[in-house]
Amino acid sequence: MINAELGHVTSVEEFNKEIRRQQEEAHGDDYCLIHDAIRKYSRGVHNYMEIGVHQGGTASVALLEKFKRIQLVDISLSRYNKFLKPLAESYAIENNIEIVTKETDGRTIASLGWSDMLVIDSYHHAAHMIKELNLHGGTVRKYIIAHDTSIINGRPDDQLFRCLRDWGEANGWKLVEHCVKNVGYTVIKRG
């Protein structure tokens, strides 16, 4: 994933439009369809959690959806802190949103927090994802959405799709969407 140049943006709305434009310009049309999936499944979501924040593209969607509590987990929040954090903090105050950031690995107890929707876009290996799912799955009330479930590192690879689907089936979740355009995303819903 590219590091978008976002020093010129002055609002969360502009950040969201610009990061999507730059990412899709670099990675192809439909790279950011996960943004649309977050919006599509946002009904009834008040508490959002994201593991793997990078610069905050999907986090900006959560802000624009005005989820009441947004938890952002990443081993390094430096890229988020550089551009989105200052915009997010003022936006959160204006819209009565609580933002919680945790600079830690998504497989650790320190990363735990309950949510209605969990978005996973961290380390793209099934062995890593299964640990995140086993730790966080019981704390998610509605949806788990994973990015990069059809292509990883430019090559067809559905290991994250299979991991999420199989974990979901074993734990009472239902597969509701599997998008294979570009890098893809997958959505499961608590059964």
Model-found features: residue ranges?
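Class I SAM-dependent transferase core
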Residues: 5-29
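Short, Lys/Arg-enriched, disordered terminal segments
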Residues: 1-3, 191
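S-adenosylmethionine/decaboxylated-SAM
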Residues: 20-23, 27, 31-191
